Amino acid sequence: MQLKTTARLCIAALLVAGGALAQAATAEQSYVQSAQTINHAELALGQLAQQQGSSDEVKQMARTMVERHSALSAQLADLARERAIATPQHPSTEDERVHDRLAKLSGTSFDEAFKQAVADVHTRELALHRGEVERDGDAGLRGYAQSRVSALEASMAQAKDEW
């Protein structure tokens, strides 16, 4: 009788542990996919601004965004591959709508809308990465998230001073 009870307790513990592992994997997958979607959004915005930006400031910012998010996208793709997580290859539908709206603008109207779009994406991105840091999950993903939090905080402070 005691053996049956012990076996049942072991099975229950394994089921609970398995459920916790599945939740962690789902959280990691969600984080990676959201972060990569944002990388693609910033790449697309940067490429558009390189073509349509009217000020040197916007064009330089766009070049920096494309370089940075190309590298971040590759880094995150490597982390995802190591964890067998599929990554999206495009921005979200919402971000594609923002891109399409900006594509219809020109001159200073484009520049101002671009700066606002970047600020909005950075705000979402910062919240995403902070959440991953606080989640205390996979060490590699947490390290990536922490590096993004630091970089975004610095970037947003600089943008606030300059714009």
Regions found by a protein language model. Give the residues of each.
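His/Met- and acidic-residue-enriched segments that coordinate or traffic transition-metal cofactors
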Residues: 2-10, 17-163
